[in-house]
Amino acid sequence: MVVCIFVDESQNYFSMKRTDLLFALAIVAIFLPFALCPALYEWYKAFNAAHGMVMSFLKFGILSTMGEMLGCRISTGRYITPNFGVLPRMIVWGVLGMGINMAMIIFSKGTPMFMEYMGMESAVECFAAEEFTMNKLWVALAVSVAMNTIFAPVFMTLHKITDAHIAANGGSLKALITPIPMAERFAAINWQAQWGFVFKKTIPLFWYPAHTITFLLPAEQRVLFAALLGIVLGVLLALSTKKGK
């Protein structure tokens, strides 16, 4: 009996190690071709410039879903659970990613103009300049604070609701055509964890500085960097889930 238990545990251990390796290789496979093939990277930049919303859908759909799979691995020991729903999550993340791109455009354009309205000279010019200056840093920080204070809580709550809706529909694509019972989903949120950890801690301690760096990058690189942060988001959500329990 003891031997059987040991064998089963060993098989599970090596199975998880194998899936961890495959997950890491999948991440490398996504980015390595762009590093090895300059022509492919140039095509990506051109397509991204011409079809920014399409690329936002793809970047967030792939990378943020992988981030949630990593979070699932941390919280449950597996990358996918029966109700996880990879395909519906990818589609929902793609739509959310387009919303994030829209928010980044709105706040990166509007916040510097508001700062000039409030008396800061040349905020728009400083933010648009290629060279790094302290003024550019302050504007980038202001953009990040504005976006994450106004937009992020609504986005995070909607994301929480869509996750619960997908799980309630067994992780199937049916979730995409089934109306969301918003009041029920909203009431079911663990607000102790949502406010006490997700809003109160991750926004000021992680997202403010992370998106400050994002807004210091050239405009064409911001959405990709934000999508990469989706992997970090998956880890943070996993920690939030553990705290909620």
Show the residue positions of the predicted features:
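Loop-to-helix transition at the N-terminal end of transmembrane alpha-helices
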Residues: A46-T65
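Transmembrane alpha-helix/helix-exit interface in multi-pass inner-membrane proteins
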Residues: G97-M118, L141-L173
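N-terminal membrane topogenic signal
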Residues: Q11-I27
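Alpha-helical membrane-spanning segments of integral membrane proteins, especially the hydrophobic core
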Residues: V86-M98, C126-F151
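Hydrophobic/aromatic-rich structural module bridging two neighboring secondary-structure elements via a short loop
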Residues: S75-S108
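Hydrophobic, membrane-inserted alpha-helices
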Residues: F206-T214
